[in-house]
Amino acid sequence: MDYFKTLEINNFNDYLNHLIQGNKVVIGTSILGLVIAIFIFIKIKLMRCIELDTKILHECTKKGVGLPIDEAFEAIHKELIKHYPQFITAKRNWLLFNGGGAMGQMCVLHASLSEYLIFYGTPLYSQGHSGRYLMDVYDFMIQGTTKQFFPGKFQSIDFPAGKFSYLPMMVAKGYCCEPNSWMLEYGRGVIPLALPYFLFSSIFVTLDIVPWISAVFYVGREVTKNLLIRRKI
């Protein structure tokens, strides 16, 4: 900074404004670096709290493949409780889900700030946008088939019962569920930032906020239990 120009500054506000005007790039870079550092810190903190294993979840899902869907949910639920008795809810509560143009129903099995686990699916055909999140998402197919595609790819990728798809962090896809498609969906990462995906569809598209309120109740209850009782973020 020019020394003689500095002498003309009479107070701190003038000095601060002059500093900002002369160093916008430095300040912008500093803010960006701070945001990235905070995100990395949160990510590391959350990943240390991961309890659910994708290999175990896949094996649990296979217990229900080929069974009538009610029996499949029961069998998978029991397997999950056997492996994670302290983290899986004992009761299944179903509610409507709208997000990214798709509609189905879901049942919350586990929810914390770093992980979620749900049953999800639809007896009808449904398609939409996956959303783009700060988390990884796994869909373990129980029944039916889901299809997905990515930008620049012109053939769909099919995932029948017994298989699973993986959506990396900050990647989006188009997808569809064929009629009577059901899955066990697992996400790990910064879970709270995914809530607007569900919220905005409930408020601005369907005008039905009841499912969202129900989801907030079930998810909030599990998150609170994990934080206060199990000391899990």
Swiss-Prot record:
Transmembrane segments: 24-44, 94-114
Highest taxon of source: Eukaryota
GO cellular component: endoplasmic reticulum; endoplasmic reticulum membrane; plasma membrane
Stretches of the chain found on the membrane's Extracellular side: 45-93
GO molecular function terms listed in the Swiss-Prot or TrEMBL record: C-8 sterol isomerase activity
One protein family per Pfam: ERG2_Sigma1R
InterPro entries: ERG2_sigma1_rcpt-like
Subcellular location: Endoplasmic reticulum membrane; Cell membrane
A biological process from GO: lipid transport
Keyword Repressor attached: no
Topology Cytoplasmic: residue spans: 1-23, 115-233
Keywords: Cell membrane, Endoplasmic reticulum, Lipid transport, Membrane, Transmembrane, Transmembrane helix, Transport
Family designation: Belongs to the ERG2 family.
Function: May function in lipid transport from the endoplasmic reticulum and be involved in a wide array of cellular functions probably through regulation of the biogenesis of lipid microdomains at the plasma membrane. May regulate calcium efflux at the endoplasmic reticulum.
Protein's UniProt name: Protein erg2 homolog
Source species: Dictyostelium discoideum (Social amoeba)
